[in-house]
Each structure stands twice: as C-alpha cells, then as structure tokens.
Amino acid sequence: MSEAKRLAAEKAIDYVEDGMIVGVGTGSTVAYFIDALGRIGHRIKGAVSSSEQSTARLRQHGVEVLDLNHTGNLSLYVDGADECDPNRCLIKGGGAALTREKIIAEASERFICIVDPSKQVPVLGKFPLPVEVIPMARSLVARQILALTGGQPVWRDGVVTDNGNVVLDVHHLQITDPVGLERSLNQIPGVVCVGLFARRPADVVIVGGEPPQVI
C-alpha cells in the first residue's frame, strides 16, 4: 500500500498554491506529502503542523513551521485517515494527534484527506475509535463510553499525546450516525477530543491508485 499512499500524497500537491501556508497532518501517508511538499517548499510561506513528528519532518525539508495563533485561518489542510466513509466522514487518531488535527481542520477552508484504498469503508467503526482524555478521567470516561455506545474502550497504555493526555481506543462500534456520536462523546466530562471527523468532514478525499481517485 505504500505506493498507493505516495500516489495520493503527490496528487494532493496539485491543491497547493504559491504563497500558501499549508496545514499538515500526521501519519504514514502524510509523510509522503511532506516529502513532496519539501520539493516545492520555496513556493509556500510555510506550514502549520499537527504533531511534533510532522514538525520534525517538515524542518528536515527546510519548510518553516508556523504557529496557528499567528497565521489565522488556513486555505488548505492535508491529512490522512484511519477510515473514510462514503460521506467523507473519517476516523482519525491512530497516531494520537487527533486534537491538533481537528483544530487545524476547523481552521482550514479546505480539508484534503489522502488515503490508500484499504481505508475506504461503507460504515465507520471497524478501526477502533480514538478518544483523547484527561488522565484523571480515564476510567470515568471509559465507563461512560461503554454505557453510551456498547463499544469496548481500551486504554492505549504507554501513549501520551503531544498535549500530555491519554488515549482510549473504542472497539466494536458500527457508527451509523457519525455526527450524533461525535456530539454525544464530546459531552462526557474529561473528553478532550473524539477521533470522529463528521461535523467537519473532509472536503475532498484522494484515494491512491493509477490514477488517483478524487472523491
């Protein structure tokens, strides 16, 4: 699937315009996008990064990394996904960067999601749903998620987000109402961010292939 990821990432470069500040996500597919972005780094003003991992890779390519508080809203955000449904709703957060990813998506006029074909699903939920949680609320949130969804929350032991929080991965879900579930989980005290991108889905999904498919 690495070739499909590369093809999707390189197609996303078509959406990058001269003088842009580009929002950049996290993950294996985005790594290919960062590499491609580095080749045209002289054409853009810089990037806003969703993780320390992506920040390091951008800087390796000589791309200036900027603070979202100073840039204001962005024209373009490019990121991957763990799952994508036909309505371009996503599960994200496998790399534990979901909160910063959601912030940048919200701040961006256009959100381009780049995936390989294995990430396309008819209904979200086969991939465990990540939920970022304040550490002291981990058990409370897990109990409430179990009661609300019937899914099985599992603590991602040993993982601390860039924000200093923990992650619960909720298994055995079939998410037929992504917007409703995102809203409900966000109401649980202690939840920082839910890895459902449904209220703000992707605007365009690029599926890697020969040629890439644009949805």
From Swiss-Prot:
Catalytic activity of the protein: aldehydo-D-ribose 5-phosphate = D-ribulose 5-phosphate
Keyword Isomerase: yes
InterPro entries: NagB/RpiA_transferase-like, Ribose5P_isomerase_typA_subgr, Ribose5P_isomerase_type_A
Binding site for substrate: T26, G27, S28, T29, D79, G80, A81, D82, K92, G93, G94, G95, K119
Keywords: Isomerase
A biological-process GO annotation: pentose-phosphate shunt, non-oxidative branch
Active site: E101
Gene Ontology terms for molecular function: ribose-5-phosphate isomerase activity
First-level EC class: isomerase
Residues in the signal sequence: none
Pathways per UniProt: Carbohydrate degradation; pentose phosphate pathway; D-ribose 5-phosphate from D-ribulose 5-phosphate (non-oxidative stage): step 1/1
Keyword Isomerase: yes
EC number, UniProt record: 5.3.1.6
Top-level taxon of origin: Bacteria
GO cellular component, one term: cytosol
Oligomer and partners: Homodimer.
Family statement: Belongs to the ribose 5-phosphate isomerase family.
Function: Catalyzes the reversible conversion of ribose-5-phosphate to ribulose 5-phosphate.
Protein name listed in UniProt: Ribose-5-phosphate isomerase A
Naturally occurring in which organism (per UniProt): Xanthomonas euvesicatoria pv. vesicatoria (strain 85-10) (Xanthomonas campestris pv. vesicatoria)
Gene name for this UniProt entry: rpiA
